[in-house]
UniProtKB/Swiss-Prot annotation:
Belongs to the monovalent cation:proton antiporter 2 (CPA2) transporter (TC 2.A.37) family. KefB subfamily. Residues 400-519 form the RCK N-terminal domain. It comes from Salmonella arizonae (strain ATCC BAA-731 / CDC346-86 / RSK2980). PANTHER family: K(+) EFFLUX ANTIPORTER 3, CHLOROPLASTIC. It is found in: Cell inner membrane. One of its GO terms (biological process) is proton transmembrane transport. One of its GO terms (molecular function) is glutathione-regulated potassium exporter activity. The keyword Kinase does not apply. The chain crosses the membrane at residues 4-24, 29-49, 55-75, 87-107, 111-131, 152-172, 177-197, 222-242, 262-282, 284-304, 324-344, 356-376. It is a multi-pass membrane protein. This is Glutathione-regulated potassium-efflux system protein KefB.
Length: 601
């Protein structure tokens, strides 16, 4: 693709995303489906702005590559070892069971047995990009079903290697004398990558970080991700698997969070590009010609995979309320099918339009998943949020709560328990089904669902409540909820959790003055104890803590208009001098006073 064409394609991608994704979000169908629809619109079977789909699809796989690197950063080797049973047990069972059933059905549809095996394996794979994105949107990351879903996806990435090796064997084009030397060199190269990454990556990043230039650190991160992807691709292995391993090797390093911040913007854009490319690849001509066959294939594919996944989730011990989410989020075909079917086609395993039909079915199955998840969310909401009889008298009797608490993680639990202990009527909104079930067993009033939906807030009693306490893990969710409450429920007194100073500034700019930085108070308390351990009188240490809190809050408010690092550093130095002067005056005053109290009195 020429430079001018590439620039035009990039402009079209951005325009399509800017138009389609907000519309999809407004319709409630999710960003992923918005990207897919945008791809259909600008692709060769839509408005025809872009025709070179294969080249763009290959480039857009970098979105999956970046995503797997970030996932690897979140899993250290010990955690990965803990997941071995679900990876090689449930993951292997899902691929084998789904592939066997789907291959049998393809043989009934007049596919050659070799093509049916390849087709069954390809269709058994799920979309890593779509499933992980939807799991994050639905808050499944920390749930048991989300962890199991990730394990299945990881095994599918591992299964890419033998699946690709199987194609020439089925086609009868494999070399009579297997080249063990090449295989040995690939294994050796892979081992060198693991050992080199284990012992070299941290010293290299330590050297780069010492330069103090953030742009160089970002460039080094991109080099690592792209280098690992190209290295694995040259070995004929999965690019995503290579970057995942690189992420795992750095998961316990001190640079983990900085690496995530450097990669995150690229990951989001490239994932969007990937979904747009998948939408562009949808062959509407084949769809029109074989409409009934394709429609039946999509339904059968989704149903079979859901049944297999649901059965495995039940055998694994997943809660009944989470099984449907787990089965649905992995029910689609995946991006690996494009690679596997192209390889099989080059070996002449498919006849006529068979490959095109399978790819259309895979693409359409990916479009059904966001809609399926939305429908299951509504079903779960009716099931979990509807009237329920309890053996014991429920804690909350009044339908009109005084306070709505959003989120029941570690932060939200402390707040909710304090309010409950003081007989405050509360309603908790939570996206984790496990937490919902647990709270309902204790008789607490809890709603399952996404709190950024206006109707859910109304159902929870937002129109009658006095306050809302927002304890979301993600700052983006917090700000979205603040804006929603200010627009639809202006009477609510908003209290929010801030993860740090940046989030605190954003809340202040949005007009939220009542917030708590999650580590600030505990850090101050430990600092006070440190002063006492150094010999300072407990009363004096307490006053030092209060002065520091007051001055820090004043600085926080004053620095809102400051947008330059120079301005912030200058003001911070000034505040430190001011704090030292206050402490000096306090110490002189305390020396004149009698020891009136002790820490433990």
């Amino acid at each position: 693709m020429e430079g001018a064409d590439l620039l035009m394609a990039g402009t079209l991608f951005l325009f399509a995303a800017v138009v389609a994704v907000p519309l999809a979000a407004r319709l409630g169908i999710g960003a992923v489906l918005g990207y897919l629809l945008a791809g259909i619109a600008i692709g060769p079977w839509g408005l025809g702005f872009i025709s070179d789909v294969d080249e763009i699809l290959h480039f857009s796989e970098l979105g999956v590559v970046f995503l797997m690197f970030i996932i690897g950063l979140e899993l250290n080797p010990s955690r990965l070892w803990q997941l071995r049973r679900s990876i090689f047990g449930v993951g292997a069972a899902q691929v084998l069971l789904s592939a066997a059933v789907l291959a049998g059905l393809l043989m009934l549809a007049d596919f050659l047995w070799q093509a049916a095996i390849v087709g069954g394996i390809g269709l058994a794979m799920s979309s890593t990009a779509m499933a992980l994105q939807l799991m994050r949107e639905k808050g499944m990351n920390r749930s048991e079903s989300g962890q199991l879903g990730f394990s299945v996806l990881l095994f599918q990435d591992l299964a890419v290697i033998p699946a690709l090796a199987l194609v020439p064997l089925l086609a009868g084009s494999a070399d009579e004398h297997f080249d063990w030397f090449k295989v040995g060199m690939k294994v050796l190269a892979f081992a060198v990558m693991l050992i080199g990454g284990r012992y070299l990556l941290r010293p290299v990043f330590r050297f780069i970080a010492a330069s103090g230039v953030r742009e160089v650190f970002t460039a080094a991160t991109l080099l690592l991700v792209l280098g690992a992807a190209l290295f694995m691709d040259a070995l004929g292995l999965s690019m995503a698997l290579g970057t995942f391993i690189a992420g795992v090797l750095l998961a316990e390093s001190e640079y983990r969070h900085e690496l995530e911040n450097a990669i995150d913007p690229f990951k989001g854009l490239l994932l969007g590009l990937f979904f747009i490319s998948v939408g562009m690849s949808l062959n509407l001509g084949v769809l029109y010609t074989h409409l009934l066959w394709v429609a039946a294939s999509v339904v059968i594919l989704v149903v079979i995979k859901m049944l297999a996944l649901y059965l495995l989730a039940r055998l694994y011990g997943i809660r009944s309320s989470e099984r449907m989410q787990f089965a649905s989020v992995l029910s689609q075909g995946g991006e690996f099918a494009f690679v596997l079917f192209s390889t099989a086609s080059s070996q002449r395993l498919f006849q006529g339009d068979q490959m095109a039909l399978l790819l259309v079915a895979v693409t359409l199955s990916m479009m059904t998943t966001p809609l399926l998840m939305k429908g299951i969310d509504k079903w779960l909401s009716r099931r979990l949020n509807g009237p329920e009889e309890h053996d014991e008298k429920p804690w909350v009797e009044d339908d009109k709560p005084q306070v709505i608490v959003v989120g029941f993680g570690r932060f939200g639990q402390v707040i909710a328990r304090l309010l409950m202990a003081n007989k405050v009527r509360i309603t908790v909104l939570e996206r984790d089904i496990g937490a919902v079930n647990l709270m309902r067993k204790y008789g607490y009033k809890v709603y399952y669902g996404d709190a950024t939906q206006v109707e859910l807030l109304r159902s929870a009693g937002a129109e009658a409540a006095e306050s809302i306490v927002i304890t979301c893990n993600e700052p983006e969710d917090t700000m979205k909820l603040v804006e929603l409450c200010q627009q639809h429920f202006p009477h609510l007194h908003i209290l929010a959790r801030a993860r740090g100073r940046v989030e605190a500034h954003e809340l202040l700019q949005a007009g939220v003055t009542q917030f708590s930085r999650e580590t600030f108070s505990s850090a101050l308390e430990l600092g006070r104890k440190t002063l006492v351990s150094l010999g300072m009188h407990p009363h004096q240490a307490q006053r030092a803590q209060l002065h520091f809190r007051r001055l820090d809050m004043r600085m926080l408010r004053e620095l809102i208009p400051e947008h330059t690092d120079t301005g912030q550093i200058s003001r911070a130095r000034e505040a430190r001098r001011e704090l030292e002067e206050i402490f000096q005056r306090e110490m002189q005053q305390e020396r004149r006073q009698l020891d009136g109290w002790d820490e433990f009195e």
